[in-house]
Amino acid sequence: MDFGLSQDQRLLDESLRKFLTSEVPLDSVRKLAAGESSDASVWQGLASMGLAGVLIPEAYGGAQLGMLDAVAIAEALGYAACPGPFMSTAVMASYYLEQAGATDPLAAMAAGTYRVGIAFSDAIGTR
């Protein structure tokens, strides 16, 4: 059994890391931590690579990849300390909206023009 990434996943990872190295320098992360707003062009760049729609079906403009692909992307984004709505929009919201049959926003999410924020209350994890 092979638990490694496929050749396609390795190529995606390599392309993504090159993009992040050039587009998300550590200075931009420090500025964001200091309270400056994030650069929307980074999210649009990720969307143009198809990453905003990683789990969204092709019928809605997504890449229709799998959860392992999403994990590999999240790992690369985390390594670069890349801010953005990847987990909330491209993974959590797209997955649950599709499962619920609420497909109207998926095309805009895949295009990177619609971002979703996920909120958790204090009640989660408490008894």
Question: Predicted regions span which residues?
Answer:
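Intrinsic disorder at enzyme termini
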Residues: 1-8
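A structural signal for short hydrophobic/aromatic patches embedded in well-ordered alpha helices
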Residues: 12-13, 73
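Glycine-rich flavin
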Residues: 21-127
